[in-house]
């Protein structure tokens, strides 16, 4: 089975992101706006309980995370993905790193962690240039504290569903 680990921002901020995703993201219907902490990984059913136990421990030892969304950016030329960029911070990076150690699969989809919330992807290059130009003119300033993260499971239709939620309860 395929799994992923994410954090969801508040519903009002998801609504803001979805305003763009509806138009510019082909994956809009598959998953709400989120911060990916661990890209898709596969584990056997018998390994799942070990992973869940590790996630509970991580939740108990990590504090809630303040996020600061401060601009629109793009991964161009690697891809035409456009996203809300989140300022890196020690707590977010520590949580990300904890999810890339044993017992989790260590493979990283990208060499560098860029905290973000995708608002557009899979755009043709010509359309990307126009859209990113417009979106970069928008003043973006959003702060919130997120006190939980989710283990998602990929369903047969390609969409993602929350399998379990873990509170960030560290001291």
UniProtKB/Swiss-Prot annotation:
GO terms for molecular function: hydrolase activity, acting on ester bonds. A motif (HXTX 2) lies at residues 116-119. InterPro entries: 2H_phosphoesterase_YjcG-like, Cyclic_Pdiesterase, YjcG. A motif (HXTX 1) lies at residues 34-37. Its EC number is 3.1.-.-. Pfam families: 2_5_RNA_ligase2. Keywords: Hydrolase. The active site is at residues 34, 116. The keyword Hydrolase applies. It comes from the Bacteria. Belongs to the 2H phosphoesterase superfamily. YjcG family. NCBIfam families: PRK13679.1. This is Putative phosphoesterase ABC1741. It comes from Shouchella clausii (strain KSM-K16).
């Amino acid at each position: 089975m395929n799994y992923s680990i994410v954090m969801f921002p508040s519903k009002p901020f998801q609504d803001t992101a979805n305003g763009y995703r509806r138009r510019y993201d082909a994956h809009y219907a598959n998953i709400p706006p989120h911060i990916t902490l661990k890209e898709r990984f596969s584990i056997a059913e018998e390994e799942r309980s070990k992973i869940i136990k590790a996630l509970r421990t991580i939740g108990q030892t990590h504090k809630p995370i303040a996020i600061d969304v401060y601009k629109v950016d793009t991964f161009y030329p690697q891809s035409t993905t456009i996203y809300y960029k989140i300022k890196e911070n020690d707590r977010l990076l520590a949580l990300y790193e904890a999810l890339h150690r044993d017992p989790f699969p260590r493979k990283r989809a990208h060499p560098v962690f860029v905290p973000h919330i995708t608002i557009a992807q899979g755009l043709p290059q010509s359309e990307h240039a126009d859209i990113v130009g417009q979106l970069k003119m928008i003043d973006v300033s959003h702060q919130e504290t997120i006190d939980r993260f989710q283990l998602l499971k990929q369903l047969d239709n390609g969409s993602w569903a929350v399998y379990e939620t873990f509170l960030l309860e560290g001291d």
